[in-house]
């Protein structure tokens, strides 16, 4: 069978690498892919942009694609799933209406309130003055979010009133995030530990993936601006079996039931970004309608089930008949980024030291890379993700940093403490 994966990041490289392990899969086309997917056995890049919905549909028809997996959020919010359904093509992802869970933060907060799903107290604004008045009344720290898609960067955690006021003015008047910021959500600052809780949904049944924890801030010890994610590990020890159960009962099931009841049944990967407070109460910070990046990379390293079979079962509404199996080892992925990221950065720098031979339990997933005249060069802010398995998070971390150490380009940087919370827990034991 032929498979299509939409996207060009580290997440799509990891999904493609995992899907290629299915013996019935002949070719996995990645649109548009990157330099890493181009080199992967069974994978083939196709020069179609993720926003080119008509082009993707035409290609899937031409190649008789039997499964399409959508990586990023943009095509989902543009309605790629609806277009594939109309053409009678099998695709795993939420419809345009269901993808509002990620596409609009205001929609999501109102949905959570309607279904009594735990989240931070909030208010939505389109005008500056009422927004400023609300912030002054609430005080800092407080969180200001652009309503629409902003590539993971439209969230400002304001520690002072000045920062909050500046963020509101930037978004509502300065148009810092364009259309995405024409409405803002202001919400209470939640204290606790974050976790990424990702599940597969077929409309009603839910299959949990392994838990993970992302590191959003650009700098060590969680300093500096938010990014799309600087590294992740799986499993996340903060999600104990009791908390896992609470998340399923209090967050995931009510979300899936609520979407179905409102006429937007949800199919696809559903990612709940959670804050878990000291009492173990999970609250929803955000939803994503897709697998996280970089969480996909360590999670796929641990997945022992067949990803293609799971996606096909979900499309057939048979997720209750399959199970997911996981490597008991921990996995960690460290993002290697271009100097300047998440602000302006260089492209086109030649990357050296990429591993020529793959070692079991180690993998460099490509994100912002391209092939230029035989050289692999940088082509994005997050360039690579050095990923490794280990018997503990400490061991996985050591292996991943060893792997990262061999790779070089002008201006490359990474965080040096990915996994620090889990390692602190391991040391306490």
Swiss-Prot record:
<feature type="domain" description="ATP-grasp">
    <location>
        <begin position="109"/>
        <end position="316"/>
    </location>
</feature>
<dbReference type="GO" id="GO:0009113">
    <property type="term" value="P:purine nucleobase biosynthetic process"/>
</dbReference>
<dbReference type="Pfam" id="PF02844">
    <property type="entry name" value="GARS_N"/>
</dbReference>
<feature type="binding site">
    <location>
        <position position="288"/>
    </location>
    <ligand>
        <name>Mg(2+)</name>
    </ligand>
</feature>
<dbReference type="Pfam" id="PF02843">
    <property type="entry name" value="GARS_C"/>
</dbReference>
<dbReference type="GO" id="GO:0006189">
    <property type="term" value="P:'de novo' IMP biosynthetic process"/>
</dbReference>
<dbReference type="InterPro" id="IPR011761">
    <property type="entry name" value="ATP-grasp"/>
</dbReference>
<dbReference type="GO" id="GO:0005524">
    <property type="term" value="F:ATP binding"/>
</dbReference>
<feature type="compositionally biased region" description="Basic and acidic residues">
    <location>
        <begin position="213"/>
        <end position="223"/>
    </location>
</feature>
<protein>
    <recommendedName>
        <fullName>Phosphoribosylamine--glycine ligase</fullName>
        <ecNumber>6.3.4.13</ecNumber>
    </recommendedName>
</protein>
<dbReference type="InterPro" id="IPR020561">
    <property type="entry name" value="PRibGlycinamid_synth_ATP-grasp"/>
</dbReference>
<feature type="region of interest" description="Disordered">
    <location>
        <begin position="212"/>
        <end position="234"/>
    </location>
</feature>
<dbReference type="InterPro" id="IPR037123">
    <property type="entry name" value="PRibGlycinamide_synth_C_sf"/>
</dbReference>
<dbReference type="InterPro" id="IPR013815">
    <property type="entry name" value="ATP_grasp_subdomain_1"/>
</dbReference>
<keyword id="KW-0460">Magnesium</keyword>
<dbReference type="InterPro" id="IPR000115">
    <property type="entry name" value="PRibGlycinamide_synth"/>
</dbReference>
<keyword id="KW-0479">Metal-binding</keyword>
<dbReference type="InterPro" id="IPR016185">
    <property type="entry name" value="PreATP-grasp_dom_sf"/>
</dbReference>
<feature type="binding site">
    <location>
        <position position="286"/>
    </location>
    <ligand>
        <name>Mg(2+)</name>
    </ligand>
</feature>
<dbReference type="InterPro" id="IPR020560">
    <property type="entry name" value="PRibGlycinamide_synth_C-dom"/>
</dbReference>
<dbReference type="Pfam" id="PF01071">
    <property type="entry name" value="GARS_A"/>
</dbReference>
<keyword id="KW-0464">Manganese</keyword>
<dbReference type="GO" id="GO:0046872">
    <property type="term" value="F:metal ion binding"/>
</dbReference>
<keyword id="KW-0547">Nucleotide-binding</keyword>
<dbReference type="GO" id="GO:0004637">
    <property type="term" value="F:phosphoribosylamine-glycine ligase activity"/>
</dbReference>
<feature type="binding site">
    <location>
        <begin position="135"/>
        <end position="196"/>
    </location>
    <ligand>
        <name>ATP</name>
    </ligand>
</feature>
<dbReference type="InterPro" id="IPR020562">
    <property type="entry name" value="PRibGlycinamide_synth_N"/>
</dbReference>
<comment type="pathway">
    <text>Purine metabolism; IMP biosynthesis via de novo pathway; N(1)-(5-phospho-D-ribosyl)glycinamide from 5-phospho-alpha-D-ribose 1-diphosphate: step 2/2.</text>
</comment>
<dbReference type="InterPro" id="IPR020559">
    <property type="entry name" value="PRibGlycinamide_synth_CS"/>
</dbReference>
<dbReference type="InterPro" id="IPR011054">
    <property type="entry name" value="Rudment_hybrid_motif"/>
</dbReference>
<keyword id="KW-0658">Purine biosynthesis</keyword>
<keyword id="KW-0067">ATP-binding</keyword>
<comment type="similarity">
    <text>Belongs to the GARS family.</text>
</comment>
<keyword id="KW-0436">Ligase</keyword>
């Amino acid at each position: 069978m032929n498979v299509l994966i939409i996207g060009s990041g580290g997440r799509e490289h990891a999904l493609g690498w995992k899907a290629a392990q299915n013996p019935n899969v002949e070719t996995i086309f990645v649109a548009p892919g990157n330099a890493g997917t181009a080199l992967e056995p069974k994978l083939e890049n196709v020069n179609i942009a993720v926003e080119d919905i008509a082009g993707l549909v035409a290609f899937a028809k031409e190649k008789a694609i039997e499964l399409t997996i959508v990586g990023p959020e943009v095509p989902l919010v543009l309605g790629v799933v609806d277009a594939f359904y109309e053409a009678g093509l099998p695709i795993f992802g939420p419809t345009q209406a269901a993808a509002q869970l990620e596409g609009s933060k205001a929609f999501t907060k109102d949905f959570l309130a309607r279904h009594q799903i735990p989240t931070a107290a909030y208010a939505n604004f389109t005008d500056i003055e009422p927004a400023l008045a609300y912030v002054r009344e609430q005080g800092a720290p407080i969180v200001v979010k652009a309503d629409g898609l902003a590539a993971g960067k439209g969230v400002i955690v304001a520690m002072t009133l000045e920062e909050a006021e500046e963020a509101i003015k930037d978004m509502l008047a300065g148009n810092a995030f364009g259309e995405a910021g024409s409405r803002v959500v202001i919400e209470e600052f939640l204290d606790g530990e974050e976790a990424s809780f990702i599940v597969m949904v077929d409309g009603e049944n839910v299959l949990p993936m392994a838990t993970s924890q992302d590191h959003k801030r650009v700098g060590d010890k969680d300093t500096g601006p938010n990014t799309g994610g600087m590294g992740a590990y799986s499993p996340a020890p903060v999600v104990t079996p009791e908390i896992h159960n609470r998340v399923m009962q209090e967050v995931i099931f009510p979300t899936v039931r609520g979407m179905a009841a409102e006429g937007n049944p949800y199919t696809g990967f559903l990612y709940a970004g959670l804050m878990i407070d000291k009492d173990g109460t999970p609250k929803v910070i955000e939803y994503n309608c897709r697998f996280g990046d970089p969480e996909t990379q360590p999670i796929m390293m641990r997945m022992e089930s067949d990803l293609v079979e799971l996606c096909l079962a979900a499309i057939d509404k048979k997720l209750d008949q399959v199970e997911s199996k996981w490597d008991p080892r921990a996995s960690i992925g460290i993002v290697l980024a271009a100097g300047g990221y998440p602000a302006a950065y260089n492209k086109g720098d030649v990357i050296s030291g990429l591993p020529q031979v793959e070692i079991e339990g180690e993998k460099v997933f490509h994100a912002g890379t391209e092939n230029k005249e035989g050289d692999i060069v940088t082509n994005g802010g997050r360039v690579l993700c050095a990923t490794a398995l280990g018997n503990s998070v400490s061991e996985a971390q050591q292996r991943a940093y060893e792997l990262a150490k061999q790779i070089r380009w002008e201006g490359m940087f990474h965080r040096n403490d990915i996994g620090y919370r889990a390692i602190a827990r391991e040391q306490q034991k």
